[in-house]
A protein has these predicted regions:
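N-terminal secretory signal peptides and thylakoid transit peptides that target proteins
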Residues: 1-15
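Structured soluble/peripheral alpha/beta segments that form catalytic or ligand/cofactor-binding pockets
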Residues: 21-351
Length: 351
C-alpha cells in the first residue's frame, strides 16, 4: 500500500527523536492502560494465535502500531502528522504451506486512523481491534487475499511482564517498556483464505507494549516467543542481539495455570539456534528452531512453516520473521504452540 505521507519526509520526521529518558515504575491502571499512550514514542497491540477448522490448521497475526512524530509536535496545522498508525496482518496456511500478509499506514485523525486513550480501540480504515466492557476483543481485518474476523475472550488474568509491568530491554534504565500480556485467549470466528471461508476455534496471545526507547545502540534486533501451553501455562522469553549474534539482554516470564507469574532475570534466559532457513527473497538467515533455556526449564521452539518472513517496508520499514511455532519440552514432547518473532536479520532494526 502506498503510504499516506511521502516516505522520505516520514523517515526524516521519525529520525528527529530526542534523547530518551527512563520510564518510572508505576502501577498500571485498567481499563485506562488498555488504551493508547500518545505521550510516549512507540506503542503496539499485538495478537497471535493458532486456530483449527476441521482438519485445517492456521496461524494468525495482527498488530497495530502507534508512533509519535516528534518533529511535528509543535506545528499548529491540523494536518500535521503528529501520530502515525501502522497495521500488519497475516495468516499462515499450514495445509498449503504459505503465508498471506498485508500492511497499512496512515496519519492519525480525520476518521482514517485512530488509537483511543481510554481503552483498546485502534483502527486504520476498515481494520479494527476493539475491546468491549466485558473484556473481550473483536478484530476485523479484511485484506486483498485474506480476512480475519475473530473474537477473543480472556480465560486468565492480565499478565504484567517484568517488574509489575515495567520490562527492561537493555542495560540502561531508559531501555524499558510498559508491557502486559493476555495469554490463553479463547479465539473464535472466521478466517478467509484466497476466497474460501473457514469457521475456526483456537487459542491466542495478546501483547500491549509502549515505550520511549527500546533498543540499545549495540542491539540489531531481537528474538521473542509467546507460548500458550496445553496445560494452561504461559511462557514468554526474549533476548536482544548484538551484530555478532551475542545476547545483549534477555528476559521473560513463566506463569503456571492458576498461579502467580515468575519474571526471569536478565542473565537467566539463553537462546541457542539449532536450525536455520534462508529467505530466497532477502537472503536473510533465520533460526527456525531454537533451544531456549529458562528458569522454568529447557524448551525447543520449532517453526511449523519455515517461510514466515514478512516484508513491511511499505509501513514500518522492517523485514522480519513472525510465525506459528510449536513448543517442545526437554524430552521432545510437544507441550504448546505460539509465535516466534525474529527481527534484525535482514538489516538492523531501527526503533
Amino acid at each position: 500500500m502506498k503510504p499516506s505521507l511521502p516516505r522520505r519526509a516520514l523517515l526524516l520526521a521519525l529520525a528527529a527523536w530526542p534523547a530518551a529518558w527512563a520510564l518510572p515504575r508505576r502501577r498500571l491502571q485498567f481499563p485506562r492502560d488498555f488504551g493508547s499512550h500518545p505521550d510516549l514514542r512507540t506503542e503496539w497491540w499485538y495478537i497471535t494465535g493458532h486456530a483449527r477448522s476441521g482438519t485445517r490448521e492456521f496461524g494468525f497475526q495482527l498488530t497495530f502500531f502507534r508512533s509519535r512524530v516528534d518533529a511535528t509536535q509543535t506545528l499548529q496545522s491540523a494536518f500535521a502528522a503528529k501520530q502515525l498508525v501502522f497495521a500488519h496482518a497475516a495468516i499462515t496456511d499450514l495445509q498449503n504451506r504459505k503465508l498471506l500478509h498485508d500492511q497499512r499506514i496512515a496519519r492519525a485523525g480525520f476518521g482514517v486512523a485512530e488509537a483511543s486513550a481510554t481503552d483498546t480501540a485502534v483502527g486504520l480504515r476498515d481494520w479494527r481491534l476493539v475491546r468491549s466492557a466485558s473484556g473481550g476483543y473483536q478484530a476485523r481485518l479484511p485484506a486483498a487475499d485474506f480476512a480475519l474476523a475473530l473474537d477473543f475472550v480472556p480465560t486468565q488474568p492480565v499478565l504484567l511482564q517484568g517488574d509489575a509491568g515495567l520490562s527492561r530491554k537493555g542495560p540502561q534504565p531508559e531501555q524499558a517498556s510498559y508491557y502486559y500480556s493476555e495469554p490463553q485467549l479463547a479465539a473464535t470466528g472466521r478466517l478467509t483464505v484466497s476466497g474460501q471461508g473457514f469457521d475456526v476455534e483456537g487459542t491466542a496471545w495478546l501483547d500491549h507494549e509502549w515505550s520511549e526507547a527500546l533498543l540499545h545502540p549495540e542491539a540489531v534486533g531481537w528474538d521473542w516467543i509467546g507460548m500458550n501451553l496445553d496445560d494452561g501455562s504461559a511462557l514468554t522469553a526474549f533476548h536482544l542481539r548484538r551484530a555478532d549474534g551475542s545476547a545483549l539482554w534477555s528476559g521473560g516470564s513463566w506463569r503456571p495455570k492458576g498461579a502467580e507469574a515468575r519474571s526471569f532475570g536478565a542473565d537467566s534466559v539463553r537462546f541457542q539456534a539449532e536450525r536455520r532457513w534462508t529467505s530466497p527473497r532477502t537472503k536473510a538467515g533465520y533460526p527456525v528452531q531454537w533451544r531456549i533455556d529458562t528458569p522454568a526449564g529447557a524448551f525447543t521452539v520449532r517453526a511449523l512453516l519455515d517461510d514466515q518472513e514478512l516484508d513491511s517496508r511499505g509501513s514500518t520499514g522492517a523485514v522480519y520473521w513472525e510465525g506459528l511455532s510449536e513448543l517442545l519440552d526437554a524430552t521432545g514432547r510437544p507441550v504448546g504452540r505460539g509465535y516466534l518473532e525474529m527481527t534484525g536479520y535482514a538489516s538492523k532494526l531501527q526503533m
